[in-house]
A protein has these predicted regions:
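Non-transmembrane functional regions of envelope-associated proteins
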Residues: 1-80, 84, 113-187
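Protease-associated
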Residues: 73-115
């Protein structure tokens, strides 16, 4: 029950990186991860999600220069120690766990993977070993085979890079369509 703190990397690492981002994922009430907040931070949502930070490094890519998609957060006064999120987007997952190519770090270090496998590619590094990663249940994996955090972030990056995010229907439209589909079998 202590105060939430934002901890930056040690200075030598912080000085060496081209950008920093958050990897905060909120599960929906049913325990499934379907979305991401593109910006988050203490008292102000200023950190981009890791995938957005990566995309912003590629200033030549059109998606890096577009306005952020997503549902805006309601602004209200909050304590300075509150975690704030903004620009929520639903994700169109590219596929189930294992959809993106992945390589063992050990195999890469031992030159067992051809350099061509990485040429002109965006590369995310993370743990996928059972019990050593942040496994997330997703709509394409469910609870039986959770998706690794690095693959979840690859899906976020892929969706942003392609400009593909899912928008939620406004509540009034959702209610109307529910009514229409409920009455449809009676017609």
């Amino acid at each position: 029950g202590g105060q939430l703190l934002e901890t930056l990397p040690i200075p030598v690492l912080a000085a060496a990186v081209a950008g920093m981002g958050h990897v905060d994922v909120e599960l929906d009430p049913d325990g499934i991860a379907r979305s991401v907040y593109l910006r988050a931070g203490l008292n102000s949502p200023y950190w981009p999600t890791l995938a957005l930070a990566l995309l912003e490094l590629d200033s030549a890519h059109p998606a890096a220069r577009q306005a952020l998609p997503g549902q805006r957060a309601v602004t209200s006064p909050v304590p300075s120690y509150a975690w704030r999120r903004d620009y929520r987007v639903l994700l169109p997952f590219a596929g189930p766990p294992g959809h993106f190519p992945h390589f063992s770090y050990n195999d890469v270090l031992r030159d067992r993977i051809a350099p061509a496998a990485f040429r002109n590619k965006y590369v995310l590094v993370g743990s996928t070993a059972t019990g050593m990663n942040d496994a997330l249940p997703t709509p394409v994996s469910g609870l039986a085979r959770p998706m690794s955090g690095v693959e979840y972030n690859a899906n976020v990056f892929d969706a942003l890079r392609q400009g593909l995010t899912i928008r939620e229907l406004p509540p009034n439209w959702s209610l109307l369509l529910t009514g229409v589909f409920t009455l449809l079998p009676m017609a």
